[in-house]
């Protein structure tokens, strides 16, 4: 900034005349302050014409000079506009507010301001007010022209090598397209060179990662029994820079192309997994008919997460995500702890997610004095990374088997030839770039730095970037970041393969930054290859694709060896899979697994199992019950580790629900207390109940609200005889009673969200608190529900939009039957209405065919209900019927696989819709003494 503003300006303003080309560019941008660019473009044009003439003469190239200059000037204009647009809008508004713009209307006043931008004196006034803006523009222009000069010189020197390597006739250069991507190391950018027949990619950094990757692809193509060989992009590594084959986008022409594309994607994923590659987002991938083209492998190896040890479970979870196939960003990367809340992955394109975290700015009201920048949310991009067939995007979700087949074949090849792979890597001269923070974060800082208050002096700009100093142990790194950002560059860090040092902006060496070198990290990774690891990565692939919302077709989950007559053997298969997927903190006191979830705002993500009984929390109860039944301490211990983690991160501000809120935590802690006899779990349960506040602002139904919690509290009271539980139930019950009495809308039928759930809670509370009004009102609700019973269907009508007749735990006859048997137990006397409903509900279970295997709305839920009715009502024939149903269902699973409750999941360990609920029912079939979680019973 020591340069004098006027001295810099003199360079650009020495000639006010401009060419037809510059005038045309400025006129095309007239609605967005086009005249502001004129002196800068004129200067660039003169320099470029001289450089191109010198290049042509020295290296005997012919070229389309006008086209090339026009393209480069367009790139320069884009960068100048990005730097200056906010300042120019502010300046326009200053003059507008002071009535210093001529014109009768908004357009005329804007045109008057744009005309002022052609006045050298006015430009000097602007830049004297904002000298940092001039410095940034001057730096950008100098760097851009230096890039072009350097590129041309290297092209001339490498002419013959390029011709031989890529089979390109480079004699005629027709265009130079500088990418709009990030700039590094004094404005260096990837650039596309167009020749008369083909194009070529110039990269202002070495291509050692691409060279190594290509060598490994060649090796595995020789060794693997691939259905289809892997393809690669040719490259010429020149040390400090390189040339790469230009990939051309092409749609799939057949179903075979689609299979090849995703098969090769899966195989490439296995190679990237070796390196823990972390930057395969949508901008780095192009769909090329039957193969993905990966054209930016600068960050081939990610060693940052792997070299940082963490004792906390969350640290292990983050590390697992980063170091697994999920961390490559090739798969849909919807991680709950990630900085992005929409999909930017290499496979993105089918998701329509809108971000609530990330925004961009676009110009509005251009060409008027109302011109401004509006803030718009980012959305999942739809770019040429997505494969197209018959004018539609081909979803990766519908091609899971292709991806897994390719991954399996390549993984096994790498595993069987690990020594040779390591030898190839060891001999390479790999230099890796490291992205220490999300590039989008740097972009935010750079965008903010174009606000006028950061353009008045360099100290204000430094003050903005100093906000990066949140960790004093990283001061060397942050100094490098600030150094680059001050030049409006994205910081650039790199390291050699065998070094633990890191190099900042290619100039500052920071020793011992990593605890392991890149080679050590790669060696550790490939040495952990095994059947267990392979299965885990396949699970992660399925979970990642499950975050895409399309339903799964022609897919069923195979449980493994399935013994029809051995309930516990099947349950053990599920438990052992969970054990293999579990992640532990360093003390082995806490654990979790990664699962796909749907958040309350209906977004899909991958994250650690939650504390909700409905989804992750139920896994704890399944493991604890199985461990007790088998006398297998490892399952009980894992349940404790899962619970300890949940208790360390539990959110006590959640809803009161027994399935998805505080009630889940109460139930799980109490259940674990009964299994382990550890008082700390009971104390936590008691504390949670004591903190329950009766509030009107909560839902009321059995699953998501207070009705289920009331039943749970009363069940615990029956065991513990502690007044706290019934007092809380009475408080919640009175509010439920009053709320339902004032309810104007028709209530749904069924247990989970309807009349049965309300009636059960009120009648049970009425009997235990001796309040007849609750019993009477509960019976009134049952009569109301029975008005929707259809004798011809042997079932109650579902009052949602489709008016179907279902028989599940959540909706329809099965859940209603469970409600009636529990009410029958509570009132301890015969009631014709309740008895008839119970028999009708049992009939509906026997005649209804389920489409799912789950316990919420599937066959195992109905099996559990038959078992509970048989046990509670002393009806042994129903217990036998439940076992008959189970035998048929297990036989079906052995042939056709498991159908999850949500058909958009490939693999699901959740309790109510997935495997662990099925597993828990199998335990109850083996030993009826375990409580039914569907009725919130306790041990």
Predicted regions and their residues:
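CBM-like carbohydrate-recognition segments
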Residues: 855-856, 873-939
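C-terminal catalytic region of ATP-dependent kinase domains
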Residues: 1-99, 117-149, 156, 291-572
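Low-complexity, Ser/Thr/Pro/Gly-enriched N-terminal "stalk/linker" regions
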Residues: 545-615, 622-625, 629, 730
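Hydrophobic residue at the +6 position relative to the catalytic HRD Asp in the kinase catalytic loop
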Residues: 283-285
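Long, well-ordered core segments of solenoidal/helical folds
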Residues: 571-589, 634-653, 680-699, 728-745, ...
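Conserved ATP-binding subdomain of kinase catalytic cores across diverse folds
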Residues: 52-136, 142-277, 291-293
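Well-ordered alpha-helical segments within folded domains of soluble proteins
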Residues: 242, 264, 610-625, 657-671, ...
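Structural helix-adjacent loops and short alpha-helical linkers that scaffold large soluble proteins
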Residues: 560-571, 626-640, 672-686, 716-731, ...
């Amino acid at each position: 900034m020591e340069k004098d503003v006027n001295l810099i300006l003199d360079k650009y303003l020495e000639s006010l005349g401009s060419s037809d080309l510059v005038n045309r560019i400025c006129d095309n941008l007239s609605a967005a302050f086009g005249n502001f660019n004129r002196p800068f473009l004129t200067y660039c044009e003169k320099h470029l014409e001289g450089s191109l003439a010198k290049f042509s003469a020295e290296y005997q190239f012919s070229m389309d000079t006008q086209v090339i200059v026009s393209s480069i000037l367009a790139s320069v204009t884009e960068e100048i506009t990005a730097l200056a647009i906010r300042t120019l809008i502010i300046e326009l508004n200053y003059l507008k507010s002071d009535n210093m713009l001529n014109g009768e209307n908004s357009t005329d006043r804007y045109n008057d301001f744009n005309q002022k931008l052609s006045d050298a004196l006015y430009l000097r006034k602007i830049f004297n007010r904002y000298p940092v803006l001039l410095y940034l523009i001057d730096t950008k222009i100098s760097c851009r022209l230096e890039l072009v000069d350097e590129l041309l010189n290297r092209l001339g020197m490498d002419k013959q090598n390029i011709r031989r390597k890529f089979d390109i006739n480079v004699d005629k250069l027709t265009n130079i397209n500088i990418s709009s991507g990030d700039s590094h190391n004094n404005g260096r950018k990837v650039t596309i060179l167009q020749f008369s027949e083909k194009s070529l990619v110039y990269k202002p950094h070495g291509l050692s990662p691409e060279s190594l990757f290509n060598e490994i692809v060649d090796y595995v193509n020789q060794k693997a029994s691939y259905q289809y060989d892997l393809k690669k992009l040719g490259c010429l590594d020149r040390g400090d820079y390189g040339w790469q084959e230009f990939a051309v986008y092409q749609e799939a022409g057949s179903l075979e192309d689609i299979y090849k594309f995703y098969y090769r994607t899966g195989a490439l994923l296995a190679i990237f997994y070796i390196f823990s590659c972390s930057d395969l987002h949508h901008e780095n991938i192009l769909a090329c008919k039957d193969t993905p083209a990966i054209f930016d492998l600068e960050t081939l190896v990610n060693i940052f997460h792997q070299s940082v040890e963490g004792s906390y479970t969350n640290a292990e979870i983050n590390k697992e995500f980063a170091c697994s196939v999920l961390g490559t960003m090739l798969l849909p990367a919807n991680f709950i702890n990630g900085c992005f809340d929409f999909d930017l992955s290499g496979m993105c394109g089918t998701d329509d997610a809108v971000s609530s975290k990330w925004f961009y700015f676009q110009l509005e009201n251009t060409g008027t004095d109302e011109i401004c920048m509006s803030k718009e949310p980012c959305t999942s991009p739809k770019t040429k990374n997505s494969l197209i067939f018959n004018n539609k995007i081909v979803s990766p979700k519908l091609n899971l088997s292709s991806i897994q087949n390719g991954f399996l074949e390549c993984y096994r090849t790498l595993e069987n030839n690990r020594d040779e792979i390591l030898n190839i890597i060891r001999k390479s001269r790999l230099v890796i770039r490291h992205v220490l923070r999300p590039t989008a974060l740097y972009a935010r800082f750079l965008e903010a730095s174009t606000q006028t208050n950061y353009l008045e002096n360099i100290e204000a700009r430094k003050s903005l970037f100093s906000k990066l100093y949140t960790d004093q142990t990283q001061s060397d790194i942050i100094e490098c970041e600030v150094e680059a950002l001050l030049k409006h560059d994205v910081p650039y860090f790199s390291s050699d393969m065998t070094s633990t040092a890191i190099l900042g902006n290619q100039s500052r060496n920071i020793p011992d930054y990593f605890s392991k070198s890149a080679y050590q990290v790669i060696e550790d990774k490939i040495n952990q290859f095994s059947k267990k690891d392979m299965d885990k990565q396949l699970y992660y692939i399925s979970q990642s694709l499950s975050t895409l919302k399309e339903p799964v077709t022609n897919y069923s989950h195979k449980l493994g060896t399935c013994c029809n007559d051995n309930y516990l053997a099947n349950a053990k298969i599920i438990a052992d899979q969970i054990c293999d997927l579990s992640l532990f903190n360093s003390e082995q006191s806490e654990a979790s697994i990664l699962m796909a979830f749907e958040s309350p705002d209906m977004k899909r993500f991958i994250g650690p199992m939650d504390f909700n009984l409905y989804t992750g929390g139920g896994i704890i109860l399944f493991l604890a019950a199985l461990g007790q039944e088998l006398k297998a301490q490892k399952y009980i211990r894992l349940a404790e580790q899962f619970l300890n983690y949940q208790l360390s991160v539990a959110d006590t501000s959640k809803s009161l629900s027994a399935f998805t809120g505080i009630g889940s935590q109460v139930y799980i802690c109490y259940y674990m207390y009964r299994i382990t006899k550890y008082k700390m779990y009971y104390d936590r349960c008691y504390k949670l109940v004591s903190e329950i506040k009766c509030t009107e602002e909560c839902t009321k139904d059995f699953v998501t609200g207070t009705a289920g919690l009331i039943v749970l509290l009363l069940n615990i009271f029956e065991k513990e005889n502690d007044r706290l539980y019934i007092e809380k139930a009475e408080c919640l019950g009175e509010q439920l009673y009053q709320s339902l009495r004032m309810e104007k809308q028709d209530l749904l039928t069924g247990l989970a969200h309807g009349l049965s759930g309300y009636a059960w809670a009120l009648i049970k509370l009425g009997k235990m608190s001796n309040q007849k009004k609750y019993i009477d009102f509960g019976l009134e609700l049952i009569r109301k529900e029975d008005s929707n019973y259809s004798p011809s269907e042997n079932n109650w009508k579902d009052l949602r939009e489709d008016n179907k007749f279902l028989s599940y735990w959540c909706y329809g006859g099965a859940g209603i039957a469970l409600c009636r048997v529990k009410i029958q137990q509570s009132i301890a006397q015969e009631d014709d209405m309740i008895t008839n409903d119970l028999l009708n509900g049992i009939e509906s279970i026997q005649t209804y065919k389920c489409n799912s295997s789950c316990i919420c709305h599937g066959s195992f839920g109905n099996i559990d209900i038959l078992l509970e009715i048989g046990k509670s009502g002393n009806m042994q024939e129903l217990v036998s019927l439940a076992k008959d149903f189970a035998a048929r269902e297990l036989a079906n699973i052995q042939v056709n696989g498991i159908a999850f409750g949500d058909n958009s999941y490939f693999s699901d360990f959740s309790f109510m819709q997935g495997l662990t609920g099925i597993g828990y029912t199998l335990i109850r079939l083996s030993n009826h003494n375990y409580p039914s979680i569907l009725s919130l019973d306790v041990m």
